[in-house]
């Protein structure tokens, strides 16, 4: 959408008291509401950690790595941004302190700062500001979420940068939205506003006066407590807005609109607009209430103890359930447990997600064998596809010591191997060295995968260093494993099927990154609907 406003307005979303309050979802909801009023938006995440990107961070600690179309390994909040607004993110939309310092050192070594003493102020701050102001899409609103919590040492350069942006652009082109926690103290049965007051005081000490305070709470505050926050935080009472706990994140845009968040933002900017068209959000909420059938999908992974490790995957299954009228329940199965200790008997389908390393591989392979032998629908994604090949090679094709060189570098039959051409030079580089971003996959005529996509080609996102060894394609095919999708740019099998199985598909790419609540991804939709069909057929037999 072409921008209507000139110049662009900037919205900065900060957080206080504790982390994980939902700043990313608040920013995404603001973007969705402004879109619903006809404006164009661009969302960015500013992360204060010193990693260049989250690509080498453990999902158990940081959550999933969301891969952008241009190959960026980014924070999971960018996934929320894409799903809520439909605006494709790029690697430039995730700015980390590590990325800033890396660029700074490169510039210093190149002589760009010749004669100067390179310091946090102005050099680091100026680089952050240039990332914030970069708006090549000409959006009406740029929404920047600042990671971390106000008071953290590492976030101070980013807070100083947004303070300077507000000073340089003038107040009527910027707005500060601060999300805090209003905890409920069960012993006295009260909601407490003091942490919010202290958080705003901390932010104000850094030169930033919030214009809107969003308070995360289990219940809406009475008027007198909102007035108390307004008085002690120097914020208009109309701008003290509830960010209530919800059972469904897709309720948030409608809830925030009901609480007048978008109205107050536009009032601050003195911008007129029609009321938002929230029809698509209301439709999503309506669909979420109409599910009649139920299925259980077991996700067998090694990061299942972290709620954020498989965010996009969980949302993609939810989208498929919304658009099929099926209630999808996820059973999390810890692959780090021995295979003898996991129970899949109540699972209607099995999903093996992506991952790295050999921890939990044996249990995942046993789960794949269980699905294959018992005609249970199975979807393998990235590593899940590779393990499906290993399982088939060992147990059906009888290939001795079939394995991946990721797990056993000297195996006799490397049916999965490292992709050539990913390493340049003698030094082994872990970060950013994989096959990343969107590539085209050609689908075989007459295959199940082609009928699912209703197309002979598909563009999906990748994040992998290992792939199926094409030298074993023929021998595996002769034993009944059909390779029905191949990379357009290299000799690399990317889709497999078992033709005689009710639904058994492996894909090397990550389809979950392109599913939205408004348009379920066809692969997940087929997986969910076919699972219900198989369940009903087995119950009749």
Swiss-Prot record:
GO BP, sorted A to Z: 'de novo' CTP biosynthetic process; pyrimidine nucleobase biosynthetic process
InterPro entries with a match to the protein in the record: Class_I_gatase-like (IPR029062), CTP_synthase (IPR004468), CTP_synthase_N (IPR017456), GATASE (IPR017926), GATase1_CTP_Synthase (IPR033828), P-loop_NTPase (IPR027417)
Domain Glutamine amidotransferase type-1: residue ranges: 296-537
Binding positions for Mg(2+) per the UniProt entry: 77, 145
Metabolic or biological pathway: Pyrimidine metabolism; CTP biosynthesis via de novo pathway; CTP from UDP: step 2/2
Listed EC numbers: 6.3.4.2
Entry annotated with the keyword rRNA processing: no
Recorded family membership: Belongs to the CTP synthase family.
NCBIfam families: PRK05380.1 (NF003792), PyrG (TIGR00337)
Name this polypeptide is given: CTP synthase
Organism the protein comes from: Anaplasma phagocytophilum (strain HZ)
């Amino acid at each position: 959408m072409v921008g209507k406003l000139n110049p662009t307005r900037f919205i900065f979303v900060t957080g206080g008291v504790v982390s994980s309050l939902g700043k990313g979802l608040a920013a995404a909801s603001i973007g969705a509401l402004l879109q619903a009023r006809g404006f164009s938006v661009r969302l960015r995440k500013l992360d204060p950690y010193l990693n260049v990107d989250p690509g080498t961070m453990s999902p158990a600690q940081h959550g999933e790595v969301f891969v952008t179309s241009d190959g960026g390994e980014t924070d999971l909040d960018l996934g929320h941004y894409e799903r809520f607004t439909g605006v494709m993110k790029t690697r430039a939309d995730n700015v980390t302190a590590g990325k800033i310092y890396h660029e700074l050192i490169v510039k210093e070594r190149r002589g760009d700062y010749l004669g100067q003493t390179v310091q946090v102020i102005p050099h680091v701050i100026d680089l952050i500001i240039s990332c914030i102001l970069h708006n090549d899409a000409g959006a009406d609103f740029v929404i920047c979420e600042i990671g971390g919590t106000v008071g953290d040492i590492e976030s101070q350069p980013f807070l100083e940068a947004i303070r300077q942006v507000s000073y340089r652009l003038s107040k009527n082109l910027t707005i500060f939205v601060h999300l805090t926690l209003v905890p409920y103290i069960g012993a006295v049965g009260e909601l407490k506003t003091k942490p919010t007051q202290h958080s705003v005081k901390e932010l104000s000490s850094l030169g930033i006066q919030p214009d809107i305070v969003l308070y995360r709470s289990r219940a809406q505050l009475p008027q007198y407590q909102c007035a108390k926050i307004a008085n002690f935080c120097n914020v208009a009472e109309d701008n003290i807005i509830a960010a209530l706990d919800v059972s469904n994140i897709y309720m948030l845009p409608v809830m925030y609109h009901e609480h007048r968040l978008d109205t107050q933002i536009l009032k601050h900017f003195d911008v007129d607009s029609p009321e938002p068209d929230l029809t698509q959000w209301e439709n999503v909420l309506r669909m979420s209430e109409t599910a009649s059938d139920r299925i259980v999908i077991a996700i067998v992974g090694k990061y299942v103890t972290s709620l954020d490790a498989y965010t996009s995957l969980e949302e993609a299954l939810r989208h498929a359930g919304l658009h099929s009228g099926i209630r999808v329940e996820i059973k999390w199965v810890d692959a780090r447990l021995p295979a003898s200790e996991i129970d899949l008997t109540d699972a209607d389908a099995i999903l093996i997600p992506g991952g790295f390393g050999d921890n939990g591989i044996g249990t995942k392979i046993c789960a794949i064998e269980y699905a294959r032998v018992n005609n249970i629908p199975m979807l393998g994604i990235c590593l899940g596809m590779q393990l499906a090949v290993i399982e088939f090679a060992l147990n059906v094709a009888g290939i001795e010591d079939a394995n991946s060189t990721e797990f056993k570098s000297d195996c006799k039959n490397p049916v999965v191997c490292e992709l050539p051409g990913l390493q340049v030079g003698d030094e082994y580089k872990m970060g950013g060295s994989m096959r990343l971003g969107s590539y085209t996959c050609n689908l075989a005529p007459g295959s199940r995968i082609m009928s699912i996509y209703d197309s002979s080609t598909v563009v999906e996102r990748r994040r992998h260093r290992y792939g199926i060894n094409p030298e074993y394609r023929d021998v595996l095919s002769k034993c009944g494993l059909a390779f029905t999708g191949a990379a357009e740019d290299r000799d690399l099998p990317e889709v497999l099927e078992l033709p005689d199985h009710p639904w058994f598909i492996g894909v090397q790419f990550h389809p979950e990154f392109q599913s939205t609540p408004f348009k379920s991804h066809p692969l997940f939709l087929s997986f969910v609907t076919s699972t219900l069909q198989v369940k009903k057929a087995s119950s009749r037999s």
